[in-house]
Amino acid sequence: MTLESMMACCLSDEVKESKRINAEIEKQLRRDKRDARRELKLLLLGTGESGKSTFIKQMRIIHGAGYSEEDKRGFTKLVYQNIFTAMQAMIRAMETLKILYKYEQNKANALLIREVDVEKVTTFEHRYVSAIKTLWNDPGIQECYDRRREYQLSDSAKYYLTDVDRIATSGYLPTQQDVLRVRVPTTGIIEYPFDLENIIFRMVDVGGQRSERRKWIHCFENVTSIMFLVALSEYDQVLVESDNENRMEESKALFRTIVTYPWFQNSSVILFLNKKDLLEDKILFSHLVDYFPEFDGPQRVAQAAREFILKMFVDLNPDSDKIIYSHFTCATDTENIRFVFAAVKDTILQLNLKEYNLV
C-alpha cells in the first residue's frame, strides 16, 4: 500500500470519526433543546400578602413530597411568633383607635405581651398563653379585631388565636393547615419545581412588597405563564408600605404593568382572585361601593362583588386578542387549589402543545 493510499485511508477514518462526533453533538443539542422545552416556567406575581407563598406550599402538598413531621416541627416557632405578632398589632391598635379594655387586668397583660421580642420567641410559656387568651376574650380587643381594616393584621390572626389551647399543649406539632397559615414575608426569590406528566413545572415566587419588586426583572425570560394573585378581601384595606393607598388599587396598577410588559407578549396570563372565603365574611359589613364608587351591584352579595372585581382586572388588559384565564380561589383550601390547578395545568399544556412537542 502506498503512503498516499495509507494517508487517504487514515483521513477517511478521521472524517468518519469527526462526522460521528458531530452527529452525536447535534443529537445531544436536539435532546437538550427538547428537554429544556419540557420545562414550563410559571411566574407567581401579585402584591404583598395576596397568597403566593401559600399557593407554593399547596403545590408541595398536592404535587410534591408534602410536609413530613420533621418539616412541620420546623414551623412550630413560626406559629408562636405569628400569634405574638398578631396580638402585639392589636395592642398597638387599641391605643391608636382609642379603644378601652373591658377588664382592668388586661392592661398588665398587654404590657407583658408588648415587651416580647417576637424574633427571639421559640417557646410558648404558660404566662404568655394565659395573657394572650385573656386579652383575646376581652370585648375591647374583639372590637379592635372587627376594625382590623384600619391597621395591619395578618389574615391568620383569628385562626391561631381561637386555637391557642391546642397550640399551647406540650409536644404541639403544627398541622398542615397551621403550616399553610403561617405568615413569613417573602424576601428574595423562591423557586419550586415539580414534575407532572414528565414535564417540569418550575414555579417562581417573588416577594410582593414594593421593595422586593426590583429583584424580579431577571425572572422575566422564557416565562410560559404569569399567575397573578389578587386578594379579593383587600378592597377596603391600605398598604403596609403606605397607609393612604388602597391595596386593591395597588394590585390593579401592578396587573396593568404586567399585562402591558413586552416581555410577556407570549406568556399566558392566569388570574387567581384569591381569599374568596374572606370576601364572603367581609362583604356582609364592609360595602364595596364605599371604596369603589363605580360599583352599582347589590350590597352584601359576595358573588356580585367578586364579579365586579374580576371585570375591573380583565378590563386592564389592552390586548383584546389575549385571553385572561381567571379562577376564584381560597389558597388555604387544599381541595380548592387541587381542583383549580388541574384546570390551570390543562390550560397551560393546551396552549403549549406544539411548542413543547407534547403532540
Curated annotation (Swiss-Prot):
<dbReference type="GO" id="GO:0046872">
    <property type="term" value="F:metal ion binding"/>
</dbReference>
<dbReference type="GO" id="GO:0001750">
    <property type="term" value="C:photoreceptor outer segment"/>
</dbReference>
<keyword id="KW-0807">Transducer</keyword>
<dbReference type="GO" id="GO:0007603">
    <property type="term" value="P:phototransduction, visible light"/>
</dbReference>
<keyword id="KW-0564">Palmitate</keyword>
<dbReference type="InterPro" id="IPR000654">
    <property type="entry name" value="Gprotein_alpha_Q"/>
</dbReference>
<dbReference type="GO" id="GO:0005525">
    <property type="term" value="F:GTP binding"/>
</dbReference>
<feature type="region of interest" description="G2 motif">
    <location>
        <begin position="178"/>
        <end position="186"/>
    </location>
</feature>
<feature type="lipid moiety-binding region" description="S-palmitoyl cysteine">
    <location>
        <position position="9"/>
    </location>
</feature>
<dbReference type="InterPro" id="IPR011025">
    <property type="entry name" value="GproteinA_insert"/>
</dbReference>
<keyword id="KW-0342">GTP-binding</keyword>
<feature type="binding site">
    <location>
        <begin position="274"/>
        <end position="277"/>
    </location>
    <ligand>
        <name>GTP</name>
    </ligand>
</feature>
<protein>
    <recommendedName>
        <fullName>Guanine nucleotide-binding protein subunit alpha-11</fullName>
    </recommendedName>
</protein>
<keyword id="KW-0378">Hydrolase</keyword>
<dbReference type="GO" id="GO:0005834">
    <property type="term" value="C:heterotrimeric G-protein complex"/>
</dbReference>
<dbReference type="GO" id="GO:0060158">
    <property type="term" value="P:phospholipase C-activating dopamine receptor signaling pathway"/>
</dbReference>
<dbReference type="GO" id="GO:0003924">
    <property type="term" value="F:GTPase activity"/>
</dbReference>
<dbReference type="GO" id="GO:0016020">
    <property type="term" value="C:membrane"/>
</dbReference>
<dbReference type="InterPro" id="IPR001019">
    <property type="entry name" value="Gprotein_alpha_su"/>
</dbReference>
<comment type="similarity">
    <text>Belongs to the G-alpha family. G(q) subfamily.</text>
</comment>
<feature type="region of interest" description="G3 motif">
    <location>
        <begin position="201"/>
        <end position="210"/>
    </location>
</feature>
<feature type="region of interest" description="G5 motif">
    <location>
        <begin position="329"/>
        <end position="334"/>
    </location>
</feature>
<keyword id="KW-0963">Cytoplasm</keyword>
<dbReference type="GO" id="GO:0007213">
    <property type="term" value="P:G protein-coupled acetylcholine receptor signaling pathway"/>
</dbReference>
<feature type="binding site">
    <location>
        <begin position="180"/>
        <end position="183"/>
    </location>
    <ligand>
        <name>GTP</name>
    </ligand>
</feature>
<dbReference type="GO" id="GO:0007188">
    <property type="term" value="P:adenylate cyclase-modulating G protein-coupled receptor signaling pathway"/>
</dbReference>
<dbReference type="Pfam" id="PF00503">
    <property type="entry name" value="G-alpha"/>
</dbReference>
<keyword id="KW-0449">Lipoprotein</keyword>
<keyword id="KW-0547">Nucleotide-binding</keyword>
<dbReference type="GO" id="GO:0009649">
    <property type="term" value="P:entrainment of circadian clock"/>
</dbReference>
<feature type="binding site">
    <location>
        <begin position="46"/>
        <end position="53"/>
    </location>
    <ligand>
        <name>GTP</name>
    </ligand>
</feature>
<dbReference type="GO" id="GO:0001508">
    <property type="term" value="P:action potential"/>
</dbReference>
<feature type="binding site">
    <location>
        <position position="186"/>
    </location>
    <ligand>
        <name>Mg(2+)</name>
    </ligand>
</feature>
<keyword id="KW-0460">Magnesium</keyword>
<feature type="domain" description="G-alpha">
    <location>
        <begin position="38"/>
        <end position="359"/>
    </location>
</feature>
<feature type="region of interest" description="G4 motif">
    <location>
        <begin position="270"/>
        <end position="277"/>
    </location>
</feature>
<dbReference type="GO" id="GO:0001664">
    <property type="term" value="F:G protein-coupled receptor binding"/>
</dbReference>
<feature type="binding site">
    <location>
        <position position="331"/>
    </location>
    <ligand>
        <name>GTP</name>
    </ligand>
</feature>
<dbReference type="GO" id="GO:0031683">
    <property type="term" value="F:G-protein beta/gamma-subunit complex binding"/>
</dbReference>
<feature type="binding site">
    <location>
        <position position="53"/>
    </location>
    <ligand>
        <name>Mg(2+)</name>
    </ligand>
</feature>
<dbReference type="InterPro" id="IPR027417">
    <property type="entry name" value="P-loop_NTPase"/>
</dbReference>
<dbReference type="GO" id="GO:0045202">
    <property type="term" value="C:synapse"/>
</dbReference>
